[in-house]
Curated annotation (Swiss-Prot):
Domain S4 RNA-binding, first and last residues per copy: 94-157
InterPro entries linked: Ribosomal_uS4 (IPR022801), Ribosomal_uS4_bac-type (IPR005709), Ribosomal_uS4_CS (IPR018079), Ribosomal_uS4_N (IPR001912), S4_RNA-bd (IPR002942), S4_RNA-bd_sf (IPR036986)
Keyword rRNA-binding carried by entry: yes
Native source species: Sulfurihydrogenibium sp. (strain YO3AOP1)
Assigned GO CC terms: small ribosomal subunit
Protein name, per record: Small ribosomal subunit protein uS4
Subunit and interaction comment: Part of the 30S ribosomal subunit. Contacts protein S5. The interaction surface between S4 and S5 is involved in control of translational fidelity.
Molecular-function GO terms, alphabetical: rRNA binding; structural constituent of ribosome
GO biological process: ribosomal small subunit biogenesis; translation
Similarity field: Belongs to the universal ribosomal protein uS4 family.
PANTHER family for this protein: 30S 40S RIBOSOMAL PROTEIN, SMALL RIBOSOMAL SUBUNIT PROTEIN US4M
Job description of the protein: One of the primary rRNA binding proteins, it binds directly to 16S rRNA where it nucleates assembly of the body of the 30S subunit. With S5 and S12 plays an important role in translational accuracy.
Domain of life: Bacteria
Amino acid sequence: MGRYIGPLTKVSRRLGVFVGGDIESFQKRNFPPGQHGRTQGRKKLSDYGVRLQEKQKLRFLYGGIREGQFKRYFERASKAAGNTGTVLLQLLERRLDNVVYRLGFAKTRLQARQLVKHGHFLVNGKKVDIPSYELDKGDIIEVREKSKKLEVFKENLESRDPRSVPRWLEIDKDNFRGKVVEIPEEIELEIPVNVQYIIEYYSM
């Protein structure tokens, strides 16, 4: 299965949580597509369906990662030392597009992915245009010199509360630069996700 490129608002409505798209539309119509109003309620899911939904929530939260790629992240996490769920989240958080989003260079992960693919960022002084590029402790991420004049970066940085940047990252707004201070141990997601259900999904 490839990456989903359809309207994320519909995905959010189907999952019942906001993973992207138009937030106002989602809030007004927070019920599954094809359903007329909230009165019908959501269908009760099977055990498999519940676990599939949690996996989809996490996959789409990180910008609609391809199914095959997401499964490979899980396989790496399951073979690594430590808690599988924690390692899975660490791998997702260390993606370049996610770090660009977390630092405030982009308003959404999807926007971050596009900005990375268009070659606007350097990692440790070298251009990297691969959204899934995996960052490590000590890595420096910065906007390329010729891209610093673009309004999108100024607007995004100015609108983002610096307190929203997680502790494992640090941002230097004046120089359009960020740093991975450490590998995150405690990861706060924007929506509730039962990671244990995702582990169980891949074990079914």
